[in-house]
Structures are given as structure tokens and as C-alpha cells.
Swiss-Prot record:
Protein name (database record): Orotate phosphoribosyltransferase
Xref: InterPro entries: OPRT (IPR023031), Or_phspho_trans_dom (IPR004467), PRibTrfase_dom (IPR000836), PRTase-like (IPR029057)
Similarity remark: Belongs to the purine/pyrimidine phosphoribosyltransferase family. PyrE subfamily.
Subunit structure: Homodimer.
Species lineage: Bacteria, Pseudomonadati, Pseudomonadota, Betaproteobacteria, Burkholderiales
Binding site for 5-phospho-alpha-D-ribose 1-diphosphate: 29, 75-76, 105-106, 109, 111, 130-138
Residues involved in orotate binding: 37-38, 134, 162
GO cellular component assignments: cytoplasm
Alphabetic keyword roster: Glycosyltransferase, Magnesium, Pyrimidine biosynthesis, Transferase
Highest taxon listed in the record's lineage: Bacteria
Length: 225
């Protein structure tokens, strides 16, 4: 499930301007050599994270998904959930609603409040917020944490859907990691933008048009139908 096209296009341009989205030749986590690279960790200033959170908030509002709170899986999801909650608090569609959020620690704390969870108690319908889905490990762990607390995972909200098939080259799945997550947990995965949005920008922008053939070839080999 992608966000509105105007928002998606704006986000791709924003990612390029911030150096988060780059073109070239990159060895990615899956072991593949990709003609583009998306590193959300480079949204690393107050202004860039603030604007990023506005994109997350808008994508969630546009999705129409009913939710009660946000959850950010450690570590990248922590600032994303926090900033998105702030952005939602100021979003006109929320009509003044104050959305709670929580996140987990990788290591349990044995003093103070203790445990692995920080923030609001997990309850109701919870949206998991992360940057991308590669293998789905973070989502699986988040779902287990949310269900263990008696709450319901409502959706996953990510920045970019690479729209590529999961698995090694000699045993490619017909589905992407995003599709597998949606099917396994029976909940939607909402992305601010996708590979299709990147290709749309490459087609319409002379500055980056030279990268389009390489990205198309990559999609032809690994892209989901």
C-alpha cells in the first residue's frame, strides 16, 4: 500500500536532496549489487527528521487505518516513532488527538522502571514504524512484543518499499519481504514511497535520467509483479 503519489514524489526528491537516496553501484544487505541505495540513517538532523516525520504522519493519515498508538522497534524505529507522534499531534486531520508511542530496548534494564519497553503501555491497535523491511525480523519481533502485551498489531509503516523479491538468487521468492510480512501477519504495510516512485522521478528528471536503465534492469531481475 503506497502513499498518495504527490507525497511519494515529494519524498523521493527529499531523500535525494538529503543524500539518503543515491545512485551508483552498492552491495546491499541481501548480497545483491543494487543501482541505488537508501540509507534512512542519513536523516540525522532536527530539520530532516522533522520533515521525515511529516511524511510518515501524512502516509498514515492517508492510509485510513484505524490505530491507537505507535511502536518503534529498536534501534532505528525509536526516533521514527517518536518524531511521527510529534508530527501527528500537529496534523490537522488528527483534530488535536495526542497519539501515544512506545519502543523497546535490545537489552533488559534491571533498575529503575526495568524491562525492555519504554513509553506508553502497549494497548489497542498499534502501528509499527520502521525505515524499510528487508527480512522481516524486526517486524516479527515487534509483533511478538505487541501481542505479548495484549495489544493488536494494526499495520507497519515504512519509508521505502523496494518492491523486490526476497531470498537468494538461486531460490528467489515470488513475493517481496513486504508482501510476505503482510500475508504472514494479516496486516497492511504502508510505505511513503516505493521503487515505482523512484522510477517515475528518473523518467521525469533529466539530472538523474541516466540511472533509469540500470534501475529498470534491476527491477526486471528482482522486482515483484
Amino acid at each position: 500500500m503506497a502513499a498518495a503519489s504527490a507525497t511519494s514524489t515529494d519524498f523521493v526528491r527529499f531523500a535525494l536532496d538529503e543524500g539518503v537516496l543515491r545512485f551508483g553501484s552498492f552491495k546491499v544487505k541481501s548480497g545483491r549489487t543494487s543501482p541505488y541505495f537508501f540509507n534512512a540513517g542519513l536523516f540525522n538532523s532536527g530539520a530532516s527528521v522533522g520533515r521525515l516525520a511529516q511524511f510518515y504522519a501524512q502516509a498514515l493519515v492517508d492510509s485510513g487505518i484505524a490505530f491507537d498508538m505507535l511502536f518503534g522497534p529498536a534501534y532505528k524505529g525509536i526516533p521514527l516513532a517518536t518524531a511521527t507522534a510529534v508530527a501527528l499531534a500537529g496534523h490537522p486531520a488528527m483534530q488535536g488527538r495526542d497519539v501515544p508511542f512506545a519502543f523497546n530496548r535490545k537489552e533488559a534494564k534491571d533498575h529503575g522502571e526495568g524491562g525492555t519497553l519504554v513509553g506508553a503501555p502497549l494497548q489497542g491497535r498499534v502501528v509499527i514504524i520502521d525505515d524499510v523491511i528487508t527480512a522481516g525480523t524486526s517486524v516479527r519481533e515487534s509483533v511478538e512484543i505487541i501481542r505479548a502485551a495484549g495489544a493488536e498489531p494494526a499495520a507497519v509503516l515504512i519509508a521505502l518499499d523496494r518492491q523486490e523479491r526476497a531470498g537468494p538468487d538461486d531460490a528467489l521468492s515470488p513475493h517481496s519481504a513486504v508482501q510476505d510480512v503482510a500475508k504472514t501477519y494479516g496486516m497492511p504495510v504502508v510505505s511513503i514511497a516505493s521503487l515505482a516512485d523512484i522510477l517515475a522521478l528518473l523518467q521525469g528528471d533529466a539530472q538523474f535520467a541516466g540511472n533509469r536503465e540500470a534501475v529498470l534492469a534491476y527491477r526486471g531481475k528482482y522486482g515483484v509483479v
